[in-house]
């Protein structure tokens, strides 16, 4: 995994390989980066972890997590597959709940197809000061 600052942006970028421990490693980088604690840090960290787990489970390559420190906070996870993710139709299906979890935690979320694959993004509103 490689951690880098986005040039000219107040964000964090974490590149990850295709390894089952990537979700755990991303959690250890994302959580301390978020300046607010409490539920915002918990929600963003869990969402990033779930999206990275999806990349590891459903693709043959790694990807990148990016965060922008703004309001709302923006999380993006890029991968190199063009296939769109899908929400599970039946809640009793085993596994596959990552997008549903992100949908519950985030203010909004979506998918953007890119020339090199796709980006799943989510926004998180900061709690009032």
Descriptions of predicted regions:
Residues 19-22, 40-44, 59, 94, ...:
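Generic hydrophobic secondary-structure packing signal
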Residues 1-13, 56-129:
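Conserved beta-strand-loop-beta-strand hairpin that lines the nucleotide-binding pocket
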Residues 23-49:
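Conserved short strand/loop->alpha-helix "switch" segment adjacent to the catalytic nucleotide/phosphoryl-transfer site
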Residues 16, 34-37, 92:
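Active-site oxyanion-binding pockets that recognize sulfate/phosphate
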Residues 46-55, 63:
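Long, contiguous hydrophobic alpha-helical segments, chiefly transmembrane helices and signal peptides
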Residues 30-37, 54-59, 67:
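Alpha-helix C-terminal capping segments
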């Amino acid at each position: 995994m490689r951690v880098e600052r986005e040039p000219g942006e107040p964000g964090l970028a974490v590149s990850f390989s295709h390894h089952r421990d990537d979700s755990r490693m991303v959690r250890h980088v994302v959580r301390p980066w978020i300046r607010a604690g409490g539920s915002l840090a918990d929600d963003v960290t869990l969402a990033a972890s779930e999206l990275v787990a999806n990349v590891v489970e459903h693709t043959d390559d790694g990807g990148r997590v990016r965060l922008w420190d703004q309001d709302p906070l923006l999380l993006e996870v890029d991968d190199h597959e063009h296939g769109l993710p899908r929400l599970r139709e039946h809640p009793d299906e085993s596994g596959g709940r990552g997008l549903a979890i992100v949908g519950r935690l985030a203010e909004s979320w979506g998918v953007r197809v890119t020339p090199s694959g796709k980006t799943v993004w989510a926004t998180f509103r900061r709690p009032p000061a």
